[in-house]
Structure formats: structure tokens, C-alpha cells
Amino acid sequence: MKKIYLIGDCHLSRVSEHYEEDNNQVDMTFWGKAAKKIWDLDFEEMYKEDELSSGKESQKFQNDGVIPFSEIKDDGILFSWFGYVDVRTFLSAYGNADVVAYKYIKQLTGTFKNSNIVIIEPLPQFTEMLLKYEGISPHYTYEQRLYQNSDFLESLHVYAKEAGIKNFILQSEILDCLGVSKLIPEMTHDKAPHPVDGLQDKYNKKILNLFIKKALEL
């Protein structure tokens, strides 16, 4: 059975809720953390501090799904799913998509030297900036975020190619598996007391199935 380590932000935590250890074709270990952005990534420090994941958003018991970063080993296949928070909240303010993409690849290749790295492009942006209602995040238009998303992906693929990373899961593949052309507010869950940019369970399950399919193809 293939061993897959997955690291990412809150969207990965939500996807992990649908993984069944005893009824699956691949062995997956999930480390997802809410609001984790590429600019904060320092894998050496995360190993040193043994940083904890957020765990599952819908927890069956306290700390359900919470694991230390030391459980992410450099000996198998690594799926990395970061960038959503950067595109949503920060790139429009700083205009540094190229720098962020470069930092991301350097962190991955400098730390996971023995892994087969698969980069998952960031979850596509929602058409509406949902967190604006609580003042949690600055508000940027859909067009602004799409522009930054495009810049980031262009640089990401350039630096990944230079580093010898060939395996990607594209945003277009994520949208295709969901059967939509874009992410809209009606697709978000209502588990929080305010609007959040998190997908409903039925969509996260489809994304998990896409990840499993891609893992089996490697």
C-alpha cells in the first residue's frame, strides 16, 4: 500500500475528515493547519517545534486529527497544498507572488529531499470574499484575487520545473471533480457562526477521492 503524507492549510483539514483508515486504497497521513500560508513556512522550525496541526474542523472528540509535524516523514510521497491564504489575503497587498512561489519551492526541495513531491495548486478562490463579514480578512475583489492567483501559478510552475518537480494536481482538476467552473458562496458549509470560505462535506469528499486517484497513478 502506498504511503502518502499530506500537508496544507484548513482545506486539507476539512478533506481529511472523509478519509477512512480501515477502508482505503492508500495510507494517508494528514497535517493541515488553519490559516497556514506559504510566507510562514519554515519546515526546519516546524520540525524543531514539532508544530501541531489544527486537526479536523468537525471533531468527534477533543483533538481529533491533531498530529505533530514529526509524523510527516521524508521517505515517501508528499502532497503539498498551500497558497490559498496567500492568494486570498496577502498577494494583492504586497504584489510578491513570484517571491512567495520561489520561497515555497525552496522550502519543499530543501526539506523533502527524499520524497516524491506532488504540488496541489491552491484551492480556487471563491467568487465572494466571505470572511469580510466578520472583519477577519481584508477584502479584495474576485478579479484582484484571480490576477494574483494567475501570477502565483505561473511562477510556481517555473520554479517547480527548475527544481525537477513534475507532479501537480491542477486547479482545473479540482473544479472538474466538483463539477463546477468556479467556487460560489452556495457551496460553503454553515458549521460556523459566520460565513466561511470552506466547502461543504460533499465537495471535500470529492476532493479526497481526486487525491486518492492521483496517488494511485504515481
Give the positions of each predicted feature.
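Short, Lys/Arg-enriched, disordered terminal segments
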Residues: 1-2, 213-218
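Conserved SGNH/GDSL esterase-like catalytic core that processes O-acyl groups on lipids
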Residues: 3-103
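Short, conserved phosphate/pyrophosphate- and ester-handling motifs at nucleotide-, phospho-/glycolipid
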Residues: 9, 196, 200
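Conserved alpha-helical elements of sugar-nucleotide-dependent glycosyltransferases
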Residues: 11, 152, 203
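Short, well-ordered alpha-helices that flank and scaffold nucleotide-derived cofactor binding pockets
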Residues: 17, 21, 158, 209, ...
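Phosphate/oxyanion-binding active-site loops and adjacent basic polyanion-contact surfaces
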Residues: 58-61, 199-207
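Alpha-helical cap/lid subdomain in secreted, periplasmic
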Residues: 68-197, 206, 214-216
